[in-house]
Structure formats: C-alpha cells, structure tokens
Amino acid sequence: MENKGEKIAMNPTVQTLAQKGDKLAVKLVTRGWASLSTNQKRRAEMLAGYTPAILAFTPRRPRMTNSPPRTSRNSPGQAGKSMTMSKTELLCTVKGTTGVIPSFEDWVVSPRNVAVFPQLSLLATNFNKYRITALTVKYSPACSFETNGRVALGFNDDASDTPPTTKVGFYDLGKHVETAAQTAKDLVIPVDGKTRFIRDSASDDAKLVDFGRLVLSTYGFDKADTVVGELFIQYTIVLSDPTKTAKISQASNDKVSDGPTYVVPSVNGNELQLRVVAAGKWCIIVRGTVEGGFTKPTLIGPGISGDVDYESARPIAICELVTQMEGQMLKITKTSAEQPLKVVVYRM
C-alpha cells in the first residue's frame, strides 16, 4: 500500500498540484499516504489517474428445499383433493306452539340433506366423504319482547336414535339449550374431527354416515303457528374424495322416490301433496297417463308463489315455484285414486 502511495505522490499531476498549493497534494507529498482519509485517498487516486482493479463477486445462493407443510386432521382441505365450505344457511322458520305440551321438529345432519344444507347439498353430490370442523345452530327471534313462549334446541350425536317426543326425552339429549322466544340463543355443537362417508341411500347405517340429529322444541305460546323467529345453521365442512356427480333431480311416483329429497310426497285418497323441504326456487313437472288424469295443481302455504302451466289433454303440469320457507305444498287432485302420477323436481 505504501508503494502505491509513493507512486501516486510522485505522479507529475500530483507534483504540479502540490507546487500550486493544492491542499490534498501538499498533504500527500509532505506527510505521506497514511495521513489521508479514505475519501482523500480516493480523490488522490483520481488525480493520478490510478484505476483500482475491479473485483467481481459471485453471490452465494443457498439451496433450500421446503418440505410439504404438515397438516392436522382439522385443517382445511387441499386443492384438487377436497373442498372446504364455511357458510351460514337458513334452516327453518320457527313457529309457536300453545300449551305446556311441546312440539318437536328434527333434522338429520348430513351434507346431502337438502332440508339442513340447501346450498351445500348440491356441492356434496360431487364427493364421497365429509368432515365437520365447526357447527353452530343459531336462533334469531322475530317477535316482540312481550311474546310468551319458549324455544329449545338439542342435539343427539346418534342419528339412529328415535327423536324425542316429551320434555324428559328432550332434556336427556347430550347437548341442549333453552331460551325465551324473544331472546337469541346459540347451540354450539362439539365436533369430533372424524371423516365420514356421505349418505347415498336410506339403507345406509346412520351411525356411520350421519353426524347426528338436530331437534327443535317450542311450547307455551299464546297463539299457534305464528312465526316467532328463524333458525340458522353455521358450519365449516370439508368435503373430500371427489367422485362422479350423484343425481341432482328427484323423480318419484305416489310411493317411491329416487334422488335428493326436495319434496316429500304424501297420498290421501285422490290427493297427492308435495311438501317442499327447504326455501328456494324449484321446477316441478307432474305427468299422468290418461287425458284429464289430474286437475291443475294448486299452491298451499303463505310462503309459496309461482306459475303453473297445465295441459289436461296430455296431461302435464310444469310448475315454476319460489318457496320463502320450508313446509310449503303443491296439491294435485287425481280423477282416480289408482291413477299413477310421475313427478320430477329440479332445483333452479
């Protein structure tokens, strides 16, 4: 480094500047290279036309291999193999019951059950298995604070058990809550993290395919069949094991039904009633075998509307319906009790 400093000090340009009184050149010539600061040394190099060697550096890039993230049993699904749905859906409209004897309504918790999961049930037709990671039933009141009556929610993790028909049976359920009609209440249902097969038919073992059974009980109201609130189901469900799409339309006659349960048929003499299990938009096609085999279908219920196109000669009826709540009906009167009818129901 001293040889470098001496060479720069002896440079003709530096010597000339020193003779002219340049402070940097004078300092370098009289006091030496070591007396200069870093910036002064750089300036002296520039004055002498000295170009330092260019050093090339190749940055080191460490190679890292990230292992696949470890997932837990309760983690969300993986793209291409499963799908996670987190949603809140309308379960039912709650109606009051008079007197001290309670009324009961129940639902089996299964992803393809349209009555419980109106929207999820359509997606579930593409999968074989499911796992519930969070489940809550919410009661939302729609009555005044002066309304009398009680609303109770219960859950049984064994869907094969007979639903309760008494207060004693209801309060024997493993999980239940109760509230005044004008007060909101949540039933948080414990989940077990198990992966279950999705129910394909009524003959499947409920202990293996169904998550459990929800129960609603009402009593003590001043008026019967008055709307007091709504039930919502909030869930996170992982659908897995993709499969071919199951049937998405329901076909039935007076006795046998195939496909998802959108409507529940019941026969009373010459009358066929189709009870819609959930709110939504539906296309219902009714066909007979002889001319004038049935009359024009009629809509029954405060929450149903739509158009009915009817031809008696064929005979056929095409009904485009909107239901605002579950339990609305389509009534068909046959000209003969033995007259068979075919019904096909589509979700719109």
UniProtKB/Swiss-Prot annotation:
One of its GO terms (cellular component) is T=3 icosahedral viral capsid. It is found in: Virion. Residues 240-348 are annotated as: P domain, projecting. This is Capsid protein. Belongs to the icosahedral plant coat protein family. Residues 82-239 are annotated as: S domain, virion shell. Capsid protein self-assembles to form an icosahedral capsid with a T=3 symmetry, about 32-35 nm in diameter, and consisting of 180 capsid proteins. Also acts as a suppressor of RNA-mediated gene silencing, also known as post-transcriptional gene silencing (PTGS), a mechanism of plant viral defense that limits the accumulation of viral RNAs. The keyword Hydrolase does not apply. Residues 58-84 are annotated as: Disordered. Binds Ca(2+). Ca(2+) probably promotes virus assembly and stabilizes the virus particle. Its main location: virion. Homodimer. Homomultimer. One of its GO terms (molecular function) is structural molecule activity. Its cofactor is Ca(2+).
